[in-house]
Amino acid sequence: MADNLVIVESPAKAKTIEKYLGKKYKVIASMGHVRDLPRSQMGVDTEDNYEPKYITIRGKGPVVKELKKHAKKAKNVFLASDPDREGEAIAWHLSKILELEDSKENRVVFNEITKDAVKESFKNPREIEMNLVDAQQARRILDRLVGYNISPVLWKKVKKGLSAGRVQSVALRLVIDRENEIRNFKPEEYWTIEGEFRYKKSKFNAKFLHYKNKPFKLKTKKDVEKITAALDGDQFEITNVTKKEKTRNPANPFTTSTLQQEAARKLNFKARKTMMVAQQLYEGIDLKKQGTIGLITYMRTDSTRISDTAKVEAKQYITDKYGESYTSKRKASGKQGDQDAHEAIRPSSTMRTPDDMKSFLTKDQYRLYKLIWERFVASQMAPAILDTVSLDITQGDIKFRANGQTIKFKGFMTLYVETKDDSDSEKENKLPKLEQGDKVTATQIEPAQHYTQPPPRYTEARLVKTLEELKIGRPSTYAPTIDTIQKRNYVKLESKRFVPTELGEIVHEQVKEYFPEIIDVEFTVNMETLLDKIAEGDITWRKVIDGFFSSFKQDVERAEEEMEKIEIKDEPAGEDCEICGSPMVIKMGRYGKFMACSNFPDCRNTKAIVKSIGVKCPKCNDGDVVERKSKKNRVFYGCSKYPECDFISWDKPIGRDCPKCNQYLVENKKGKTTQVICSNCDYKEAAQK
């Protein structure tokens, strides 16, 4: 039996660490939290200074029994849960269950799961930091008080299964506020004039800028006609040439929030998927002869700090690969409000390149690792240098301007460009070499009518970014928050953008009227600040809870008395039940909308809502191909005669047969491109627009 017992959260992490520590250490997993507040009751005694009642989580009995058995036999027990508040709380709960000494230096933390980092952490064990535990306890108790007080009111007055919470209610508010902006938006007409100009054999474009040396707004067609009427022929003169050198710095390495945003934009990953794959990379990948190694640092962080060791290694890689001129000379600065002493998300070793790791990784693991690796290495590279040119092109009182840009030195852009910045403005726009006084010819003057557009709906990436900018919640809360408002059917995704549902708007209105603090951004931000102060030891968690609950309790009492019951009418489905003849209605279930008999519970008939795509089933030639959704909300295509016909396709059949093998053709989408391919052979053709 090993003298030392080490407890971590997951089997994958346990497996990796045990290989590093050797035979004197036994590493086992707690499988996450082992204690929590009970689900069947509040679990917080508001009459006894908010004392929490912790119980062993249902189903964790065998795990706890196993932990106690090993702890009894070990000389030393080390708690090696994750290096954040949640991990500190897990360590504390384990310490209580195993009856370890409070003052024992048995807590070990490491930011990356590599041999050196793990061994070093065991040389410096410390006591459990109760300030961090208390900050996590305060968050948990706050969320319990909010959820278990508001939810029953919503169940009683609106509909069963609803919920509200400090972060999810603010996230829902953001989506609804944006929708109201869009509804209330009044488009305004405006015009632009673009000119195409020729100098010798070169052509370039410029936009109308000034009339009589002043900006002139083109609000109507009359304004445009005033400008075009003032033009005299096609000859223009270059009246000013401005040349500048512009430096562009690389983005910082990833935090949790920026990783979720960039993975959504570049890889089309949902926040939850990003965190799941990142956890796999952090906990350890089997590299065969090299053993199991954690490929990235801890993925729940809002710090952009980088260790000196990592900087040195990155500089060495960049120098060897690109040359000395590509290494960064600037000093990276941390972000205000970084939680604890974490690092940014980075590869545990720059020398483990994505290409070298590809054969050991799944497709998703490789794509995310490549993104993290490239972003980090680019952050340690030299800035890009751009040459910009601005030309003023004048005829009389009318001035056009052309802007051009060329890359003089690519620097970090050799490796990586952040998606949000990868726009038209960054693309090289070469202008002919012109000097003041040169003459150019206008080959085309093109007015165009436009209308102002409403603000766009939130994508998942933009919602995460906004939550972070407003300091709502923590990096670890973004993914579950977005998950919750979708599962509750408060919002739905349309073209990858969030739209509030009728139910979401009803719930929001009730919470807004009776629990205004819960959806108040400033209140939520202040609460996060107080949680930080608890972690720093500046205030007690009980004082923070009491400051909130004393007024919140009155809001709950008022809501119970005054909130009116809301009837959410079922939407008619437009057809009758084939069993009893009663009208069918649209219901919302766990996996979306479905049809149910209005005569429930006497008749329990239900049907999936299907949408015909106007194509006959290629298998039975009798049914129609209909669009369906899987339990994971992924669209697929099946036969309307199911279960008699079991035809299924992830790609959309188009109603034509392959000219090579006579099997059915499908529409296949990859990223932004769509093509028609054969479901059987290698035939393909361009999709018709």
Swiss-Prot record:
User: What domain of life does the UniProt record list for this protein's source?
Assistant: Bacteria
Protein keywords? DNA-binding, Isomerase, Magnesium, Metal-binding, Repeat, Topoisomerase, Zinc, Zinc-finger
Q: Which GO terms describe its biological process?
A: DNA topological change
* Region of interest (Disordered), ranges: 328-356
GO MF terms here are: DNA binding; DNA topoisomerase type I (single strand cut, ATP-independent) activity; zinc ion binding
E.C. numbers? 5.6.2.1
* Residue span, Toprim domain: 3-113
Enumerate the residue ranges forming zinc fingers (C4-type). 577-603, 617-645, 658-681
- Which CDD domains does the UniProt record give? TOP1Ac, TOPRIM_TopoIA_TopoI
SMART domains in the record: TOP1Ac (SM00437), TOP1Bc (SM00436), TOPRIM (SM00493)
Q: Does the keyword Mitochondrion apply?
A: no
Which Pfam families does the annotation name?
Topoisom_bac, Toprim, Zn_ribbon_Top1
**Positions annotated as active site in the UniProt record:** 298
Site Interaction with DNA — annotated at 33, 139-140, 143, 148, 155, 300, 488
Family in the record: Belongs to the type IA topoisomerase family.
- What is the protein's known function? Releases the supercoiling and torsional tension of DNA, which is introduced during the DNA replication and transcription, by transiently cleaving and rejoining one strand of the DNA duplex. Introduces a single-strand break via transesterification at a target site in duplex DNA. The scissile phosphodiester is attacked by the catalytic tyrosine of the enzyme, resulting in the formation of a DNA-(5'-phosphotyrosyl)-enzyme intermediate and the expulsion of a 3'-OH DNA strand. The free DNA strand then undergoes passage around the unbroken strand, thus removing DNA supercoils.
Can you name this protein? DNA topoisomerase 1
Q: Which organism is it from?
A: Staphylococcus aureus (strain NCTC 8325 / PS 47)
